[in-house]
């Protein structure tokens, strides 16, 4: 039980004991039992707020971080706690980082009841938190308890030795060597995506206007992207293509949408779950969470059925290593222990990779000059060939810049909270146990002191080295002082295990889209990132796709 829960219940029992003493030994006897119950409730309702207020004021006054700069305090009770859950996620933290300097590389602000938050604002502090001392911190208990509903008992919800041990089971599957083997499957899935778009264009009525000599249609892009990336997740997890892009296994697609679609009710429940003691939170009824539990049960049953069917086959490797085949070959397979990991891989394909690819396609549509540059690079790289070799996608500097710059501006996770589980330090500054640490990819990725005055603007050139005009190459850090300044995939020992897979799929999908379609925004609507965990565009977000002619004149 959390320390806060224990303190609240202790106050309640002390109040009850005090009333017992008054009635048993001092002769203060109420005329009926209702007065006794009322007295207990009154005692509890008075003592609890007084205790909380006293503790809050004491913690704020005695804070060892009061000398650190941060946003202006709003009030002494809950202060900036709701800025953590703002929408779009991390917007306020990004503004705070850019509005002033932080000489020590640390920002400080208070949250609910005097809880303290430290946000590293430079790469030195980030390296310590994410790499050097990464296991001095854990995801908050309330977050882990809530995320079990989405991911099960998996890498997302695990910590310390269990997390470290299970992370190693992912590495052989998601390392660059295995992803190289999977690349043809990623290209094939990207072509299925394009075929789906083309099928929509085929159904365009005669009255639909033509653009650039090709058919055109407005496409709900987010739904289609999530189908493709969810299929990819199942290929790496189980060696099974769900083929949701072809209209199959839509029951799983609907279940994931039920879990991850963001709405007002879910946001309120998420905030309450993080702020209230667990025993109070459980008393609040929620139809939304009941439907989420049904979706979770459906997904568990579906994954178990697919896993058992795959294990019944004689060959489970499918020409590449999957998470399931790796566990079986290693002799570590345990049905109950790893079912959550399999679900998480598919869920990450649906939510994290799906959101990332959706935003890259949006940036392609919103930056027409960049789209033209990518198309020109692809045309020149093919040298008359029908298609590129698999390893060529990863060597194209403009394509790489298109993907990296889009992911920089739209990281999957805007803000990640950690809690110090032991006394530690950041850049020599003492961090007591229990302090909350805010890792803010959105703010770091858009910090002017790290990326320059145009940090919040789209700029392909920051990722391209043109020192040799005839042979431009990729610039790994985008001009930032350290790789830790680009947090779209995290950094260090707790970084995203699926980075190589995500980059390989996104590059191929963008290249094949640009070769076949011209993409435009339909209106001035901006896809504000939203979501309980990963940041995604709205499910109804749409872009215009128009077929382009093959060849140089399509540019």
Question: Positions of the model-derived regions?
Answer:
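Cytochrome P450 heme-thiolate monooxygenase catalytic core
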Residues: 36, 139-145, 181-357
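Conserved cytochrome P450 K-helix E-x-x-R motif and the immediately C-terminal K′/meander segment
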Residues: 82-98, 305, 386-427, 550, ...
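Cytochrome P450 I-helix active-site segment
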Residues: 183-187, 209-215, 251-260, 317-324, ...
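C-terminal helix/juxtamembrane-tail motif
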Residues: 1-4, 536-555
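Short, small-residue alpha-helix embedded
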Residues: 352-365, 509
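N-terminal membrane-proximal hinge/A-helix region immediately C-terminal to the signal-anchor transmembrane segment
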Residues: 2-165, 187-192, 243, 295-298, ...
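Cytochrome P450 heme-binding "Cys pocket" and the immediately downstream C-terminal segment
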Residues: 199, 368-370, 481-482, 495, ...
